[in-house]
Amino acid sequence: MANINNLYTGEALDTIAGFPTVYHYQPSDYDTTKPLIVCVTGGLHLARVFYGGHDGSTPSNFLSYWLSKQGFSVLCLSYPLETNPPIMPATGANFRISDWGQQAANTTAKIINCKNLSSRSVVLISWSMGGRMVVPFTIAAKNLGLHVQQYIAFAATPGFSSIRPLPPGITCSSSGYFRVPPHVDVFLGQLEEMRVLNGGAVVIPEDVYLREYIGGTPINLIGLGLKYDPVTRAFVRDEVPHEEDTRVLDVGNFPLISALYPTSVLDASHALADKASWGFLLTYKLEHMIGRISVSNMQGTPEWKRLLNLVHDAPERLCVPVPGNHFFFVGESSARDVAGRVAELIDDGTAFERGLAGLIS
């Protein structure tokens, strides 16, 4: 339910790391030493897609509710977005990937300290464009005394520059944000498919979605090689390569990588590419974890064969398909199913790292 500040119940508006943010914390349903799950949203969307809260909203239609039932506390983070009606001050046009990672880490540390959580371990989930901020978040979190034990990509894009041509309709708002495109039919079609997959009840009415769930995005986050120039009040080419901002090839500073990816043709790009893209980064992350010294005496041993099999099987084991499209975690049955898959993936990630350590110790 929204209040006079256009915030939903349980949301907090704050300025953290120099920029506005809205965050939502949901405690675990029972005392636990499980890591805090941090959910970071994607392009054009508030983190409300993880927890809902609009008038008439049903909590069980959203992921945060079911993760709390699994024993996790959940922190959902919205970066600076420009919305109508306004939710945050529109002061984030120059918000960069590095700012995103720092803001998310600072907010995470704040919640862990304020809520007196027993664990300083974190599992990061980021959706869609949120895949670009994983390394900056992990570095900033480590500097704050936090341990990011695992990353789970949700139909997420790694921090490479877009290999596709610039899409049409990129326009700059008066505040310097990338405007919500006039046609968001792709997103609406995907939400409709999720409605059908979840038994037919509307989860987010179209008018509510357009008014309260999406907003203009800082252009630098999108990976198009653009930034906002306050002098010309327009988007211009960014002199900093996107890969330098995202540090996507700094594999040593990734946590253990895992992924949930959609299977619907309505999100064909992620359905086709996510296993390969995150599997690629996972493999190089594992190579970095293993190191040359660890394998120097393994030639011809059974342990070397087991290590090869463990690494080669990792993308299949840790990158898991999920029924649905870009919003595969929205809707009661989908949200409940995905929460269970998240819990299983965290357990499997822990077991995987234990098995790897046993081979290279």
What are these regions (language model features)?
Residues 287-361:
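Catalytic active-site module of serine/aspartate enzymes centered on a nucleophile-bearing elbow/loop
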Residues 44-58, 86-95, 166-168, 269-278:
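Short, flexible/disordered intra-domain loops and linkers
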Residues 124-134:
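Gly/Ala-rich beta-loop-alpha elbow adjacent to hydrolase catalytic centers
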Residues 168-302:
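Alpha/beta-hydrolase
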Residues 1-32:
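N-terminal cap/lid segment of alpha/beta-hydrolase-fold proteins
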Residues 28-79:
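Short, surface-exposed "cap/lid" segments of acyl-processing enzymes
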Residues 87-115:
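Alpha/beta-hydrolase active-site loop
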